[in-house]
Regions:
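Charged, low-complexity surface segments at secondary-structure and domain boundaries
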Residues: 12-16, 42-49, 95-102, 136-139
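Non-transmembrane, amphipathic alpha-helical segments
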Residues: 15, 19-22, 26, 47-54, ...
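Intrinsic disorder and flexible coil segments
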Residues: 9, 32-35, 39-40, 50-51, ...
Length: 170
């Protein structure tokens, strides 16, 4: 009877480990691409301990790198360079359109797929005719029905599906 109790107490740890392994496989392609683009994100001590902690840290790195990508892309989109290489000046008091920050009226999976396609189109070795146009900051906004973790996982899942379908491994 005692061994049943002991085995039962280990079950949550085993479930966490298998869940974390699955999540790690899901986020790895996106983490690799964003890590290539932003090698300085996440410099420092890596957490040791349960795999779920390490997965959470990697999700945090993805979130940080997505923020950096989006900030740079949004700035470039709002500050186009003219033929002379000069950037237009912004008028004092000019503000961004608030509607640009509202969540897009699409299902969360489509929203995540759009973000994944934007990252995928800008990857190293992407065909020159691939359009890597930034969809806008609103597309990165987490849907209300998703937690932070679920949202990063959804984007990573959509990115992983793109890499698998375009490499013929599906």
């Amino acid at each position: 009877m005692m061994w049943v109790c002991n085995a039962g107490s280990l079950l949550p740890s085993v479930e966490d480990w298998f869940g974390a392994r699955h999540e790690l496989r899901t986020i790895q392609p996106l983490l690799t691409e964003l890590g290539r683009r932003h090698p300085d994100v996440g410099i420092g001590v890596r957490p040791r301990g349960p795999l779920v902690f390490r997965v959470a840290e990697r999700m945090s790195l993805i979130s940080d790198a997505l923020f950096l990508e989006a900030t740079a892309a949004d700035a470039a989109r709002k500050r186009p360079v003219d033929a002379t290489g000069a950037r237009p000046t912004r008028e004092p008091g000019e503000t961004d359109d608030v509607s640009e920050l509202e969540s897009p009226p699409v299902p969360p999976q489509e929203q995540a797929r759009t973000i994944a396609q934007w990252i995928y189109a800008g990857r190293e070795g992407a065909p020159k005719d691939t359009n890597a146009e930034f969809p806008g900051l609103a597309w990165l906004r987490q849907p209300t029905s998703y937690s932070d973790r679920e949202w990063i996982l959804e984007i990573a899942q959509q990115y992983r599906l793109l890499t698998l379908s375009n490499s013929g491994s599906v």
